[in-house]
Amino acid sequence: VNPTVYSIEKNGMDHADCIMCVSELTRRTVINEYHQDPRKVFAMHNAVYPLSQELLDIPRPEHPKEKVVTFLGRITMQKGPEYFVEAAALVLQRTRNIRFVMAGSGDMLNAMINLVAERGIADRFHFPGFMKGKQVYEVYKNSDVFVMPSVSEPFGIAPLEAMQCGTPSIISKQSGCGEILDKVIKTDYWDIHAMADAIYSL
């Protein structure tokens, strides 16, 4: 924890009359780690807007010979990208008829490219870079499975967006959105074997 950031955050909370959190997970953190009065801390989950007709009309291509499994987000420690790569390596020991996509940018991108090469799975992995707007929904619709292996996620909007596109999702138990999503598979972010089993089963 960065003490300067913590001090600024706590000072703001100390002077607030009401603190709105995006999940019960975050609410507990605010109460326990920032020592706030539970009576002024409330959880209000995030939501997504209904898709526009333009996004609804994005075609969903079929992948009869290969499945596509996607990670989409910041490629940083908080998002757990290395667990996605390690789980992918385990899945590819069982079958080669899968392609993995890591869409996004971040300070761990080069490390993930190197890790993929070390695991010998570069021919099954794609790094298309940062996505925005309509591109994000095109990626979701091109995916057979979406994975969010976050180490720490106050909420996490991406699985809701993926599910809007009809893409089944696997999320970490450490994600706040898991409090409202019951039609997803949940694993611990560090349990790459459970994550690999979930990917393979879908």
Model-derived features with residue positions:
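Membrane-proximal helix-turn-helix segments that form the acceptor-binding/catalytic region
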Residues: N2-I19
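Short hydrophobic beta-strand element within catalytic cores of glycosyltransferases
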Residues: P168-I171
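Nucleotide-activated donor-binding/catalytic signature segment of Leloir-type glycosyltransferases, i.e.
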Residues: I113-M131
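Conserved acidic donor-binding segment of nucleotide-sugar-dependent glycosyltransferases
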Residues: V184-H193, S201-L202
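Conserved donor-binding/catalytic core segment of Leloir-type glycosyltransferases
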Residues: M20, P61-A88
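Carbohydrate-associated surface elements
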Residues: L25, A47
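Aromatic "clamp/platform" in nucleotide-sugar-dependent glycosyltransferases that forms part
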Residues: V151
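Short alpha-helical donor nucleotide-sugar binding micro-motif in glycosyltransferases
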Residues: F130-M131, E138-S143
